[in-house]
Amino acid sequence: MRLIIEPDYDKLSKWAADYVIERIHKAAPTAEKPFVLGLPTGSSPIGMYRELVKACKEGCISFRHVITFNMDEYVGLAIEHPESYHSFMHRHLFDHIDILPQNIHILNGNAPDLTAECDAYERAIEAAGGIDLFIGGIGPDGHIAFNEPGSSLTSRTRIKTLTTDTVLANSRFFDNDTNQVPKRALTVGVGTIMDAREVMILVNGHTKARALREAVEGAVSQMWTITALQLHRQSIIVCDEAACVELKVGTYNYFKDIERNNL
């Protein structure tokens, strides 16, 4: 596991966007062999998306031969609702880049058969050749996508009931009214994420400090699903200084030292 520690959120976002651009360029995708990208929602990736939009508009990157799969979507929230993850992704990324509409994949939380929707999503990922780079964020309790504490570390795309902590955290997007927050979601599984050839997780702010500590220094546990990343063959956590406040001094200094030429 790599840990990239940046001074603040803006630099974290720039580093992450540059890494995405680098990986796409290195893959040199074509229509026959596209680059497959897994994408998150939430507040953490917004800065990265802003940098990617800027780079696309400046001609530094093209998404024409990129296929995307989003991590999750609420159950029962209309696609056109401003807080649906369909709306989020189009607002922050898809409407501003040259991606082909048919290459965008987001779970349908209003599908008549939610289990069939989840199974079809797994098949679509497999048909695309698997995910080259899966990007994610984490919650204060260390959940990745909507894989809440207690989720199996080999789980696949499925329906999940959201914890009270997650509902409370997400209520900030719903006028701080927990009654408006959907209580279920469709989410890729921990196993789905772990199947990606690379995983990059964005962690920012003091509220994620304990989760970062568990991710880097803790034991692998289903109670902190982010810890599964320790078992991935090629994983990166990109964080800011604020998220590092609970790391041991030795851990912090170690990663600052070995990554000093990559910051």
UniProtKB/Swiss-Prot annotation:
It catalyses: alpha-D-glucosamine 6-phosphate + H2O = beta-D-fructose 6-phosphate + NH4(+). Signal peptide: none annotated. It holds the Pfam family Glucosamine_iso. CDD domains: GlcN6P_deaminase. The keyword Hydrolase applies. GO terms for molecular function: glucosamine-6-phosphate deaminase activity; identical protein binding. Keywords: Allosteric enzyme, Carbohydrate metabolism, Hydrolase. Disulfide bonds: none annotated. Pathway: Amino-sugar metabolism; N-acetylneuraminate degradation; D-fructose 6-phosphate from N-acetylneuraminate: step 5/5. The record marks S151, R158, K160, T161, Y254 as: Part of the allosteric site. The active site is at D72 (proton acceptor), D141 (for ring-opening step), H143 (proton acceptor), E148 (for ring-opening step). Allosterically activated by N-acetylglucosamine 6-phosphate (GlcNAc6P). GO terms for cellular component: cytoplasm. SUPFAM superfamilies: NagB/RpiA/CoA transferase-like (SSF100950). The keyword Phosphoprotein does not apply. Coiled coil: none annotated. Its EC number is 3.5.99.6. One of its GO terms (biological process) is carbohydrate metabolic process. Catalyzes the reversible isomerization-deamination of glucosamine 6-phosphate (GlcN6P) to form fructose 6-phosphate (Fru6P) and ammonium ion. Belongs to the glucosamine/galactosamine-6-phosphate isomerase family. NagB subfamily. This is Glucosamine-6-phosphate deaminase. It comes from Porphyromonas gingivalis (strain ATCC BAA-308 / W83).
